[in-house]
Amino acid sequence: MWRLKVAEGDKNSPYMFTTNNFVGRQIWEFDPKAGSPEELAEVEEARQKFYKNRHNVKPAGDLLWRLQFLREKNFKQRIPQVKVKDGDAITYETATTAMKRAAHYFSAIQASDGHWPAENAGPMYFLPPFVFCLYITGHLNTVFTVEHRREILRYLYNHQHEDGGWGVHVEAPSSMFGTVFSYLCMRLLGLGPNDGENNACARARKWIRDHGGVTYIPSWGKNWLSILGIFEWSGTNPMPPEFWILPSFVPLHPSKMWCYCRLVYMPVSYLYGKRFVGPITPLIQQLREELHTQPYNEINWRKVRHLCSKEDLYYPHPFVQELLWDTLYLASEPLLTRWPLNKLIRQKALKETMKFIHYEDHNSRYITIGCVEKPLCMLACWVEDPNGIAFKKHLNRIADYIWLGEDGMKVQTFGSQTWDTALGLQALMACNIADEVESVLGKGHDYLKKAQIRDNPVGDYKGNFRHFSKGAWTFSDQDHGWQVSDCTAEGLKCVLQLSLMPPEIVGEKMEPERLYDAVNFLLSLQDEKTGGLAVWERAGASLLLEWLNPVEFLEDLIVEHTYVECTASAIEAFMLFKKLYPHHRKKEIENFIVKAVHYIEDEQTADGSWYGNWGICFIYGTCFALGGLQVAGKTYNNCLAIRRAVDFLLNAQSDDGGWGESYKSCPNKIYTPLEGKRSTVVHTALAVLSLISAGQADRDPTPIHRGVKLLINSQLENGDFPQQEIMGVFMRNCMLHYAEYRNIFPLRALAEYRKRVPLPN
């Protein structure tokens, strides 16, 4: 039986190290002796329920670890369930009951180190590169055991569409990228060309060939297929490693790039520069025949470089970008790959590129910045030295990415531990039931204190294009090491709120110097021109560089941008901080808030909403924006932006009293309700929180009551809420499953409703 283990790692291994005793780490291990018949039956029931409903609800309920934790804690929901009948008013007692049921359930699924585990996955291209890398390096069978393979295949079967393909994420229609990667994953894991549940392989192969064959895969796919030997590097657009030795005044210098873009193309350029190709095994030769629609040796590789299937094409390459690729392909690459330039320049560039890779690996404890980068960096280390220490350290951190749900085994971004914990603790504190959850608050507080980044990246971090990180919080755990602005803002807000509570309940408050470090980090990321806050590093590079975005299915990934959600979270954190610590950088904080408020007002869309960059979509963005405006002193009466936002929310309310938004809002950039105007508990909770922030209860609380009625009536018997549509997004067009949102936001909405909306006894 599979079990989730928390805050564990081999401290004696020379190939694994940690900055804080592995606090926040979450890994899955299989124990063949574990599990009673009842436990095993419970897990199997969850799997079967997902399978039967897989075409209706695509994201998993993330139930396996929840079942484990609830069993380990002997949790039983002892508060009777409540429902609100049509025509009945919601009483204070009813709201309190529903809130406490949600709070007790949420408290029971806290991990031993104080964080809340959760799936943070959804894209179908996260997992396969791990399989590709391990296949090439010869470690596939040792890292992915028979039990791993069974669960990986379960995941692929569960998310295969009826047309035989897979999307770029679990809710997206079939695409070449998702289908080819999933097909290769099945074949490399040992399935034959006609094997798999419900003819999975044959159906997938038919989809690929019916849509033109593998030459139509997007550029990221072309890179991996070239590495595997199913494509030729001459069929890809150049990614020269000389990029990393350019002088800093060059417009597209790496220091001007968004960190994730930088760290994807760093190892890609190394592998491209070496023209590395894995072993051409009989299976690889067979895959060449299966995936191409013409004989492999007859393909004109030069002509396929710019091909991309219409199913994958979200961001077409502008003419100026294709001109750049063609110039590099026809002019510079022939020179750089021949003597003497291959010795004078290319070899130097390859060495410098690997130095950057090693620097990033070391500063993330070989977790790397994310799951797309991890297998690329790991493979680059193996290519440099198959028996080297760097590659061995990479192998030990693969487990940090593996996640298991009732839908099978997947790879996640790297984890949302700190983000979920900060939001979850704030929801619990809003309940005003500290006496019932004091140990939960204390453990969560302890986790946040241990998760804060204590130092900057080692060595010359500026020379490695890094921003300072001391005082920040990451999205996941401290070992990951990458600072994030909204995680820092929510973490800071959380520890400040906890500092107002008795230390005998929640533990000693954080030292002021560490709070100052967090403030310094947040102040450093405000854009001087717009007043908006970036996420990882300073924004400010020319947005014209986005014309060079090579990724056909994502947008806005070349340079760092500013974001409404991050800006709003920082306003909330600073408003509380300056109240408690009025003398630290007072003038700078006040100026920050003024500029940030103007930025949020300027970013409002024509319909009164705000675009959500990290959640779906306009309802999510509007909730954060209104929270920031409200704490800064803006009200319905003195702020036109708030009045317009309220109109948007009231117009978007569904007939059932709730709210529900389609993920299609994100790529289309237009508010799109769910089909049939269905509601979700997360969107409903976000809208309720927004209306409460905007003072709707003082004017007409009816829309709020209707939304809360839906939340209360949706609550499950054990205090959980149902899993519905996917709720996260990144780079406009790729969705991400935040499994904990269905607990955090309804709990917070019920707590704020009970506290701020007058209710009858």
Curated annotation (Swiss-Prot):
Which InterPro entries does this chain map to? SQ_cyclase_C, SQ_cyclase_N, Squalene_cyclase, Terpene_synthase_CS, Terpenoid_cyclase/PrenylTrfase
Q: Spell out the CDD domains in the cross-references.
A: SQCY_1
Q: Which residues does the entry assign to the active site, renumbered to this chain? A: 486
Pathway assigned to this chain's UniProt record: Secondary metabolite biosynthesis; terpenoid biosynthesis
Identify the EC number(s). 5.4.99.56
- Transmembrane segments in this chain: where? none
For the protein in the UniProt heading, the enzyme class is isomerase
GO BP terms in the entry? triterpenoid biosynthetic process
List the GO terms this entry assigns under cellular component, sorted alphabetically: lipid droplet
Molecular function terms from GO = beta-amyrin synthase activity
Report the superkingdom from the record.
Answer: Eukaryota
Against PANTHER family, the record matches this protein to: BETA-AMYRIN SYNTHASE-RELATED (PTHR11764:SF58), TERPENE CYCLASE/MUTASE FAMILY MEMBER (PTHR11764)
State the protein's purpose. Oxidosqualene cyclase involved in the biosynthesis of limonoids triterpene natural products such as limonin, a compound with insecticidal activity responsible for the bitter taste in citrus. Converts 2,3-oxidosqualene (2,3-epoxysqualene) into tirucalladienol, generating rings and asymmetric centers in a single transformation.
Family as reported in the entry's similarity comment: Belongs to the terpene cyclase/mutase family.
Name by which UniProt lists this protein: Tirucalladienol synthase OSC1
